A protein has these predicted regions:
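Short, solvent-exposed loop/turn motifs
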Residues: 12, 124-125
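Short polybasic amphipathic segments
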Residues: 4-6, 115-118
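Flexible glycine-rich active-site/ligand-binding loops centered on an Asp-His dyad
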Residues: 126-151
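Short strand-turn-strand beta-turns centered on an Asx-Gly dipeptide
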Residues: 120-122
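Mid-length scaffold segments of soluble, non-membrane domains
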Residues: 43-116
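Secretory/extracellular carbohydrate-interaction modules
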Residues: 1-76
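Cysteine/selenocysteine-centered motifs that mediate thiol-based redox chemistry or coordinate metal-sulfur cofactors
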Residues: 150-158
């Protein structure tokens, strides 16, 4: 269950879309994308506007498997120089990951001026003012060649 709205950095965000990521016929997590009321999901990503991506997990997942999947996707989406610049922050972000249990919620928030925050079960676990990090990490789900084109299409549908 995802809330229909979320308050972030003095912006009222509305849930634009939600979808489920399925891998080998098993539901892995549900995802919900939030953006400002007056913007479409695609506008929020392309501009970029304040946004939130929330994941609700159905399965146990080892944190190192999550990190590996993130790196595979980031390496597909970005050149080596970009990843080299972002690596210290990516490593710090990944260091906050915990082994995932069913019912866990991870949320990534982006707000202009405050950058990226990662929440784990409602608590801020990581924060960075770097908009390039926010763009790259949210891009794992919201940019082309990400984890799942089907999930991305569902989350960004108008």
């Amino acid at each position: 269950n995802f809330a229909t709205t979320h308050e972030l950095a003095q912006n009222n965000l509305e849930r634009k879309n939600q979808s489920v990521l399925t891998y080998l016929w098993a539901d892995v997590y549900a995802a919900a994308f939030y953006a400002p009321t007056k913007a479409s999901a695609r506008q929020a990503v392309s501009t970029p506007l304040t946004q939130r991506l929330e994941l609700y997990y159905f399965r146990n997942i080892d944190s190192q498997d999550v990190v590996k999947a993130a790196w595979v996707t980031l390496e597909r989406q970005h050149d080596a120089a970009t990843l080299q610049r972002l690596r210290p922050e990516l490593d710090a972000l990944h260091a906050t990951f915990k082994d995932i249990q069913p019912g866990d919620r991870y949320a990534q928030n982006f707000a202009a001026g405050s950058g990226l925050t990662l929440e784990i079960n409602g608590n801020v676990a990581y924060s960075s003012p770097n908009p390039a990090l926010a763009r790259a990490y949210l891009g794992i789900w919201l940019s082309p060649d990400g984890l799942s084109d089907e999930l991305r299409t569902s989350l960004l549908a108008d």
